């Protein structure tokens, strides 16, 4: 029942994310939205990374759950980098996001591919399958953060 409810909520969230830019009344709302989405993603990815590094015991069920959440939510923050959110709004987003949108889009696509593979690897149910997918996803995150996020 809990999984069904979570799936419904996540599916609804993803479906509404596509027109999300139109939902923000103020640029500050978009910034808060993308920061919140990134926080949730980081929390769930952190558990996967800890398992891959041996800092947490491997739990196939938890890995599959967390990877699915990461893969589902990964698309959400990118709907909130719209017009007007490039000003100083207490955000770490660099101007490069808006100056080179093609490069930013390429980084997004790399992340989306990595999280899809992460989700599949976690479903395999083995730590050996999970480790390289966590590494690739971490690299995709880092690549975007290096180019588009201030320290």
Can you say where each PLM-predicted feature lies in the sequence?
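Bacterial N-terminal signal peptides that target proteins for export
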Residues: 1-8
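N-terminal signal peptide c-region/cleavage motif recognized by signal peptidases
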Residues: 17-19
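Sequence context surrounding c-type heme c attachment/ligation sites in exported
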Residues: 24, 28-60, 66-151
């Amino acid at each position: 029942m809990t999984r069904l409810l979570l799936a419904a909520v996540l599916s609804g969230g993803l479906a509404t994310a596509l027109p999300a830019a139109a939902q923000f009344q103020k640029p500050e709302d978009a910034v808060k939205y993308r920061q919140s989405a990134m926080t949730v993603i980081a929390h769930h990815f952190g558990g996967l990374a800890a398992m891959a590094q041996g800092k947490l015991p491997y739990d196939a069920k938890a890995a599959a759950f967390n990877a699915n959440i990461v893969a589902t939510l990964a698309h959400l923050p990118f709907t909130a980098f719209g017009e007007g959110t490039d000003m100083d709004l207490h955000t770490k987003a660099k101007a490069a996001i808006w100056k080179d949108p093609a490069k930013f889009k390429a980084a997004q696509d790399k992340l989306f591919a990595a999280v899809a593979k992460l989700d599949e690897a976690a479903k395999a149910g083995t730590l050996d399958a999970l480790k390289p997918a966590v590494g690739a996803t971490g690299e995709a995150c880092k690549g975007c953060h290096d180019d588009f996020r201030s320290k």
